[in-house]
Amino acid sequence: MDKKTFLQSLRNIQRLPSKIDINFDESRKILYIGVDSLSVCKNMQEDASAFEGWIFCIYANRKREIERVILSWDIPQIKNLHYKRFLYRVLKMQEHFLWFAPSENNVADIMDFKDSVYTAGNLFLNYPQNDSKTENIKEKTEAYFERAFLDPENLFLNTSFDVCNHQLPVGIFRDKVDKEHGLFPYGKSAIDLWAIKADELWIFELKYNNKKVGIISELLFYLWIMEDLCFHHRIRYDLQKEIPSIRDFDKFYSAVQKNISTIYGVLLVDDLHPAITSELIDFINQENCNKQIIVKTQKYKPHITVKLL
């Protein structure tokens, strides 16, 4: 079934990015997704790069008919930091969802990344360096609402946290934390909001006036990083450096060094793409092999202050 015919059969998805190709083999119940070499080297928020988000939106629509999803992509000539992050995302998708796999033509690239980088060790996260800006922030922007949510009693409905803060850096480096050793894009790469509740870690991807499917890809990526920090210990912090107290990072560090039982990832939004339904979120949680990772949604009403819904 070609792309046009297949899209006509979907609910809540009128079109896909032009640089994402799909084909559905009805007889074998396999959905094929194709991504071009430009998209794998761009920010994962962009529609054409957010393969995870589109896969879930499509699969949840047709889960009775699809048994396998195969992702293929054109390998870029220059493998930049975005591409290395893309390989990590593919690897983690395959680890968490048994019906997903890269195409045969792309397996070698994934295995090389896994053997030479992911399981080779010496992967480090960066620390926060400076306090975030607090003055002259425009009202009704994501930065504004991010600060409005810095309240342990007003971050998730009917939930009180021990501590919460924002802008947790998630730059990944090999061997050493500096510009020359960056593995993924690191500049402004950060989890919008985080919180600790007993032995639970909560992370939040905040959006305002932004209904892109890429929010799924972003949240999953941050969940995978936290999983590799807290559960698998494939990523760690450089203990040779002093643990800063900026934005309560010392409290975060202390909590994740203990036994975190569950990691929650929350879509904190005023609105969502129509394909991102509660049924889709349930589907992600049901299909995910690691039941210690749970995705949730929290909507809010954006005014000068925020109100959870």
Residue positions per predicted region:
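Charged, terminal alpha-helix-loop-beta segments
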Residues: 1-309
